[in-house]
UniProtKB/Swiss-Prot annotation:
Involved in the biosynthesis of polyamines which are thought to support the growth of thermophilic microorganisms under high-temperature conditions. It seems that long-chain and branched-chain of polyamines effectively stabilize DNA and RNA, respectively. Catalyzes the irreversible transfer of a propylamine group from the amino donor S-adenosylmethioninamine (decarboxy-AdoMet) to agmatine to yield N1-aminopropylagmatine. It can also use cadaverine (1,5-diaminopentane) and putrescine (1,4-diaminobutane) as substrate with a lower activity than that of agmatine. Transmembrane segments: none annotated. The gene is speE. The active site is at 166 (proton acceptor). The lineage of its organism: Archaea, Methanobacteriati, Methanobacteriota, Thermococci, Thermococcales. This is Polyamine aminopropyltransferase. PROSITE patterns: PABS_1, PABS_2. Pfam families: Spermine_synt_N (PF17284), Spermine_synth (PF01564). Pathway: Amine and polyamine biosynthesis; spermidine biosynthesis; spermidine from putrescine: step 1/1. It comes from the Archaea.
Length: 288
């Protein structure tokens, strides 16, 4: 796993010998933050590549295939998303998409690793201007908190219309973000009508983790939906889970608000295709 200088390539190896790789021109930056090893590469055809502990987080060319699909389905399904919490997402891409919605009055991003925010600001062109305003506390609709998202959610008195978890994969340290206890904290901090969304890993390679998270969410939320999308740089299709609190229909989105968004990957036509999981995965999920 990692950078092969002789081959000028970065390869992330998934379970069962499956790999995703990029040809790279050079390594731009590497450091050991308080929490993880962080690397940034310049690829040959996909812009810059952000890697945490050997796992691909994003490539600049195509990052919208993840951020748009994580954010806009829940934002457009909610009737009036005014307060939004983002846990993780230190590169700024998720919050950038949240703030496209003019209904949003306040968004809070809680990122545990300040090093990710700083490196993303210095080296990536994903949300540089937004991160600059957040760091300087000059973004009127959003706030950056450097801290533990699990602890923040448990202790905050804030209530949210939408909670978005943009974390690393549902293995290792991030497993707490996929626990029943965490889901209960999230449910409690949602308003009467609320939506929760999280990425849930590779459909094919993290199937067991997807099933575990889905099962735990079903114990907590009023309804739970699953969907998938091909994400550039990941072992796609990539899965997402949505938890519903109250009277919100995630299968229906606000078409008028959707028309105002000039997006690259996601649109109302795409929304209808999100739920097309492979048959064997549907059978496994529906058996939970």
């Amino acid at each position: 796993m990692g950078y092969n200088e002789q081959e000028r390539a970065f390869i992330e190896w998934y379970p069962r010998g499956y790999g995703v790789g990029f040809k790279v021109k050079r390594r731009l930056f590497e450091t050991q933050t308080e929490y993880q090893r962080l690397e940034i590469y310049e690829t040959e055809g996909f812009g810059k590549l952000l890697v945490l502990d050997g796992t691909v987080q994003l490539v600049e060319v195509g990052e919208e295939s993840y951020h748009e699909v994580l954010v806009h389905p829940v934002m457009l399904a909610h009737p009036n998303p005014r307060k939004v919490l983002v846990i993780g997402g230190g590169d700024g891409g998720t919050l950038r998409e949240v703030l496209r919605h003019d209904t949003v009055e306040k968004a809070i991003m809680v990122e545990i690793d300040e090093g990710v925010v700083e490196a993303s600001y210095l080296y990536l062109d994903v949300a540089k201007d937004l991160l600059d305003r957040l760091i300087k506390k000059e973004e009127p609709r959003a706030e950056l908190i450097i801290g533990d998202g699990v602890k923040y959610l448990r202790e905050t008195d804030e209530r949210f219309d939408v909670i978005i978890v943009d974390s690393t994969d549902p293995v290792g340290p991030a497993k707490l973000l996929f626990s029943e206890e965490f889901y209960r904290d999230a449910y409690e901090k949602l308003n009467e009508k609320g939506l929760y969304v999280t990425q849930a890993g590779s459909v094919y390679l993290f199937t067991n983790e997807l099933l575990d998270a889905y099962k735990a969410m079903k114990k907590v939320f009023d309804r739970v939906y699953y969907f998938s999308f091909p994400v550039i740089g990941y072992a796609s299709p990539w899965s997402f889970l949505v938890g519903v609190k109250g009277d919100v229909d995630f299968t229906r989105i606000d078409l008028e608000r959707a028309k105002k968004l000039d997006l690259y990957y996601y649109d109302p036509e795409r929304h209808e295709t999100l739920f097309q999981m492979p048959r064997y995965v549907r059978k496994l999920l529906e058996g939970q």
